[in-house]
Amino acid sequence: MMEQVLSFWFERHSPDQWWAKDPAFDEAIRTEFGALHASAALGELYEWRVAPEGRLAEIIVLDQFSRNLYREDPRAFACDGMALALAQEAVRIGADRAVSLERRRFFYMPYEHSESRRIHEIAVTLFGSLDDPESLKYELQHKVIIDRFGRYPHRNKALSRPSTAEEIAFLKTPNSSF
């Protein structure tokens, strides 16, 4: 099944689809991988971790698919801690270096999704290692928000967190959410 995840993400779909809010794409993920996501959230895909590509597939399921399956819902972020821990372990053992540059950035996305300033310091280094100015630019945009607010204000509504006046004003500006 890990091969199907990687094929779906990297071969059958494009970056334009990865980053767009597309109900049809979200439904394709729900139909093909909804049950798999539930298993991943329970830690049941641990056998995938024997290979770098398997680790990557598990991280994509937890980090990326969660956002597509549960838009505007707290469950979109419920697996972030697990995805980050898996990504940190993958980086620690060098699994991120065993895949192509295009795929490698998905080992780093859980760092970008973190609401920790310390984690974003590491993320800048990781994304900088890709020799991909666009990926680094997006990480830096995320980091600016975390440095300023200590969290992503655009998640507040989904997570039932109160927004400060400064966050409300910020959310009215361009590029305030992703």
Regions found by a protein language model. Give the residues of each.
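Intrinsically disordered, low-complexity activation-like regions
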Residues: 1-56, 61-178
